[in-house]
């Protein structure tokens, strides 16, 4: 049973750190190596200095991360709310030429083993968990909220979100992708919000949209700390909870690039260019597309797959998994970059996928299945550093 609770979070003091957009960052696992220096330059208080570390040695970056976080707290760059709070959160953005918003709330969620109540849709790998566990030991803090969706709708959550929007947010910024992030601090002196939300979430399954490795890390850290010190704040983790029925968060596709010999014949109808490919991929009704390099020319194809959605599962089942001679398989979010990788000869073909639907993802996991690796990209993602949950 998912249990939720308010927590006394840490917030940047805007008077000390200045521009909050320059002090915050995307989640650690979407910051490319060549972009890290840009975030470091943006502000001496950029959260990436803690989230990814600045040391050179195998352990130095973790030690430095903990020291930097403690120094910022001592200096007053990060200040505590002073009492437990719920943190309503909103992201406004343009998607498919329309304005959208996704709302949720950041809370502490009690840790439970993976199962029917806390549901993964992708597998975790040992390396990232080991990295994040060493980082969590050093920092003793949840720096970014794990993103989870529930089937909803929740009247208690919607009522809370509607109410706080009547006042200015406590923190607000626009990030490098043009997404507007707004956060409120709701201390809920009477406890009624917490009680109503907790009662509703007792019967909900939380689908992890982003943060599988962070959740697995929190489970491992809890076992360590319980063995050493018993129950404590390590029994929970910070999450952004979004009602997918009301908010309909976009799930962007992650395209596949393939190095293969021989290059197979791909079924489909030929179209002119990438623009027509993207127009074809308007819905997740088993539509797919491909670009193949033949005799130095790019050939663009569109078609439909057989089977059950989501399309990414059908693509792997029908075309990718049985394909002989695959030397390399890559994952690319930008379709133009995937096309360029084929054009330059780095890969021989690319498969393009439509945006997924949350209900398709949920249907797979509710039947006990999991999606292929790198199947979904829930976007936008909550900003790291908007609120921090300390464990000490």
Residue ranges and their predicted role:
Residues 1-392:
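Surface-exposed, charge/polar-rich loops and edge strands
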